[in-house]
Amino acid sequence: MAKKQSGQPLTAEQKRQMRRRRSRRRAVLRGIALVLVCVIVVLLWQNWDVVAPDRLYSHIQDLLGSSTGSYPVDFSGVGVQRLARVDNYSVVLTDSHLIYLNQSGAEVNRISCAYPSALMCTTDQYVLVAEQGGRRIQLSTRTSVVTEMEVDNEIIAVALNDKGQMAVLMQGSQGYLVQIKVYDRKGKLLYTRSRNQTATEIALSPDGRQVALLSIKALNGTLTSAMDVFSLTTSDTEALCSHKEADTLLYRMEYLSDGWVVAFSEDRAVMMDTANGLASVYVPSDMRVLGYAVGSDTMALVLRSYGSTGDGEVHIVNKEGVPTATIPFEGVYRDLSQQKGLYVLLTDTYAQRITANGEQVRVSVEEDGRQAVLDGDNVVVLGLNRLLSYPLT
């Protein structure tokens, strides 16, 4: 059949075919658009605590200086339990609220949180508060409460990672001594396990693939502490790796980066590589551990000689248990914290910023300081009943 000449009118059949082709194209485009809308809606729902408009609005408010208030911040008549650093804000946990303060000391948000005996974990974005000996937990961000729930039994310890995943160590049931549960940031149960061990501490890996349990038991009259690591991605009930320290009471445990977990006692730090179960132990000579802080690749230990009542040293130690810096300090130790690889030491007379290489800057502070965090080039110190900010020069 000869082709239709240019300019020749289309037949009715040709017009119908063109309409059908256009209709099919429109249907395909509508289907693609619908899928994209569904994907966007799901992503927004899953990450609303991160992308919520009020979060952006709050930051704009701070930039424009619409929040009022300044340092020092008075907390007279209010019981202040903890000071932390979250999402570039200083966060104060009181008897009744989580209070967020910007760099000027202005209050930018407060979240109701009235737990009589509170445990608090923080990451760069999330704050987890749990009722020790109770059953309530609350996960929040700078702008809102993400999850508020009750667990099955009394809480012993909690842990939190950067994804907002929460690990809860609680009293056991049905004949077990303890129960471990891990939830996502929305409160969905990801993992549960019961153990017949006297467990005291729990830690959650940054990637959410492992949970570590610290337990104690007596073997042949000797107290032994055990570090056990379990997989959250398999159904295996046995530990991936374990390490035991005889005649030692390990009392705190945290994850570093790259699958390393560290635990502390009065006289040592124990680092275990969960990839192979090999552990290294750092035991400072004739000194006891007063405090610690954990970064991504290093940790800092506050040490004091046995028999001494003042002065001491801060040791920066890497994952292999090798000290990389030693910093002497004077006075009475009060607090040690870590933000983004920098440590801040607080004594009764000064605060000191310390890098992983041992570089340091100090500033004199009032004598009633209890806790300290870094705020850019300032250090924020919690005293008996007020919060003060000091420039590090």
What are these regions (language model features)?
Residues 1-27:
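N-terminal Lys/Arg-rich, disordered targeting/topogenic segments
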Residues 29-46:
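Hydrophobic membrane-insertion alpha-helices, especially the h-region
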Residues 48-49, 97-99, 135-139, 175-181, ...:
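Structural motif
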Residues 62-75, 104-112, 143-150, 187-194, ...:
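A short beta-strand motif characteristic of beta-propeller blades
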Residues 70, 74-84, 113-125, 153-162, ...:
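Repeated scaffold domains used in trafficking and secretory/extracellular systems
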Residues 90, 127, 166-167, 208-211, ...:
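Hydrophobic beta-strand positions that form the internal "hydrophobic ladder"
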Residues 109-214, 221:
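Non-cytosolic head/periplasmic domains of membrane-anchored proteins
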Residues 176-270:
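Solenoidal tandem-repeat scaffolds enriched in leucines and small polar residues
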